[in-house]
Amino acid sequence: MSWIERIKSNITPTRKASIPEGVWTKCDSCGQVLYRAELERNLEVCPKCDHHMRMSARNRLHSLLDEGSLVELGSELEPKDVLKFRDSKKYKDRLASAQKETGEKDALVVMKGTLYAMPVVAAAFEFSFMGGSMGSVVGARFVRAVEQALEDNCPLICFSASGGARMQEALMSLMQMAKTSAALAKMQERGLPYISVLTDPTMGGVSASFAMLGDLNIAEPKALIGFAGPRVIEQTVREKLPPGFQRSEFLIEKGAIDMIVRRPEMRLKLASILAKLMNLPAPVAVSEAPHEGVVVPPAPDQEPEA
């Protein structure tokens, strides 16, 4: 018998496990491989290092408002390429691509509903839509949110995540800074609370307008907040910036924001603050029914347990 015939027939090559796309993701901060379903249940906060990942506008609003109370506002408003703007790509093509990728018509989603049974209007930025940039539709939807809050005599909450004004709309995008700020002046005249929640990142024209005009400005941990980015500032002043510059922890030390709140604690914290400001009874934290255990499949670099 030759040596070829003596090869053991029961030896089979190792098969790589087939892992569907989107089941696993990696933490941007600590690099830990995380099970997507478990991460979503944890509101996109890494359970290993507490890094707050970016969250979609709809998921944020659904996690904030009481189930079954949400009504979307301003969904009929759509962006138009009035200037026929073109850089390396036509603006209308950028819009079509962003709409297909995110399922949103523009970068701001507005809903009214209840928060611990208290009527509120809430808005949230979709950063995946052209970097959460502010154009005419974002400004119009924000004003619609203010008008609804005035009509319902209730508070307004806005979660910002934006790179600033949308350059493809030129002066029309810059006009939204004044437009939104003027609308908020009406909230102040009526004595209705406006709470601004700054998430990572909140920059440019958004940070220079309604994002910093809250009766309370609350930030998530380690959120980048400012007007120009750190690299631009370093190139301008020709100096090395201090560690953590423009992060929420740096800003609270300088008195630029009022508090930092972790995302899992945000809902109850907002409800408690608004109840005080509206002279309503404090919300009672209801313990949720325990979730069924999530069956976590082995990570791509792990072997199944015997």
Swiss-Prot record:
Binding site for Zn(2+): 27, 30, 46, 49
A Pfam family recorded for this sequence: Zn_ribbon_ACC
Keywords: ATP-binding, Cytoplasm, Fatty acid biosynthesis, Fatty acid metabolism, Lipid biosynthesis, Lipid metabolism, Metal-binding, Nucleotide-binding, Transferase, Zinc, Zinc-finger
Listed Gene3D superfamilies: 2-enoyl-CoA Hydratase, Chain A, domain 1
GO BP annotation list: fatty acid biosynthetic process; malonyl-CoA biosynthetic process
Catalytic activities: N(6)-carboxybiotinyl-L-lysyl-[protein] + acetyl-CoA = N(6)-biotinyl-L-lysyl-[protein] + malonyl-CoA
InterPro entries in UniProt: AcCoA_carboxyl_beta (IPR034733), Acetyl_CoA_COase_Trfase_b_su (IPR000438), ClpP/crotonase-like_dom_sf (IPR029045), COA_CT_N (IPR011762), Znf-ACC (IPR041010)
Annotated family: Belongs to the AccD/PCCB family.
Summary of the function given for this chain in its UniProt record: Component of the acetyl coenzyme A carboxylase (ACC) complex. Biotin carboxylase (BC) catalyzes the carboxylation of biotin on its carrier protein (BCCP) and then the CO(2) group is transferred by the transcarboxylase to acetyl-CoA to form malonyl-CoA.
Identification of the protein by name: Acetyl-coenzyme A carboxylase carboxyl transferase subunit beta
Organism of this sequence: Klebsiella pneumoniae subsp. pneumoniae (strain ATCC 700721 / MGH 78578)
